[in-house]
């Protein structure tokens, strides 16, 4: 890797940890808060320096448009969208009624026009997060989680799943005899689901996050 200053290495390592933990990079404001910078502008300066050194790629105008370069063991990374792509129109899913599809018309409260560069891969919908069970992964109450519909997910990915009558956001880990849905907050218990349980259905994986007020 290109030689980095100590501060640049801190920023790079923070980005890597965030992607490993949640599947998407931090915002400038989150970098500034974590590393004690005076403002997000200071974080932006370090990001531009890292981009000039060829260790990250930045997508213009996207608060989470950061990709690490030259890293082979980052399974959650995707190619950043090219500038100039048309905006995506994404449905926002509110509360989901038991037994009905998550994208049923009655669950969609509105549509948002979103820049594709906000996301690591093309999402199918936005889900409003309720609660703080994923707080330590940077996912807070009221955030909009970008979700790509999937029927399979890898260990460690953050997923949206239907569990009985509820829809939940958790980290997926396979265990002997089933799967564990892991909360990223010690105040919440993990959930073990037995293999073949009719109560469980995977709805999709997280491919981005929009903080409340960013749209």
UniProtKB/Swiss-Prot annotation:
Where does this protein bind DNA? 28-48
Q: Does the keyword Repeat apply?
A: no
Signal peptide coordinates: none
Q: Name one GO biological process term.
A: DNA replication
Q: Which Pfam families match?
A: LexA_DNA_bind, Peptidase_S24
| Active site residues of this protein | 133, 170
The record's GO molecular-function terms, alphabetically, read: DNA binding; serine-type endopeptidase activity
Q: How does it assemble?
A: Homodimer.
Which family does the UniProt entry place this protein in?
A: Belongs to the peptidase S24 family.
Which protein is depicted?
Answer: LexA repressor
Please tell me the species this chain comes from: Burkholderia vietnamiensis (strain G4 / LMG 22486)
């Amino acid at each position: 890797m290109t030689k980095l200053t100590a501060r640049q290495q801190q920023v790079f390592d923070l980005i890597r940890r965030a992607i490993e933990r949640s599947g998407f990079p931090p915002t400038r404001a989150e970098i500034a808060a974590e590393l004690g910078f005076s403002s997000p502008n200071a974080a932006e300066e370090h990001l531009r320096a890292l981009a000039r050194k060829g260790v990250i790629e930045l997508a213009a105008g996207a608060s989470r448009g950061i990709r690490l370069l030259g890293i082979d063991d980052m399974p959650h990374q995707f190619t950043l969208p090219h500038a100039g792509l048309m905006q995506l129109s994404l449905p926002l899913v509110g509360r989901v009624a038991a037994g009905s599809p998550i994208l049923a018309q009655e669950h969609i409260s509105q549509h948002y026009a979103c820049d594709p560069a906000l996301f690591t891969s093309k999402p199918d919908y936005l889900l409003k997060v309720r609660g703080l069970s994923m707080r330590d992964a940077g996912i807070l109450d009221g955030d909009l989680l970008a979700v790509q519909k999937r029927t399979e997910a890898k260990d460690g990915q953050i997923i949206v799943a239907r569990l009985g009558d509820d829809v939940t956001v958790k980290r997926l880990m396979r265990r002997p005899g089933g799967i564990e849905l892991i909360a990223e907050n010690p105040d919440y218990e993990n959930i073990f689901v037995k293999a073949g349980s009719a109560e469980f259905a995977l709805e999709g994986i997280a491919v981005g996050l929009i903080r409340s007020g960013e749209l």
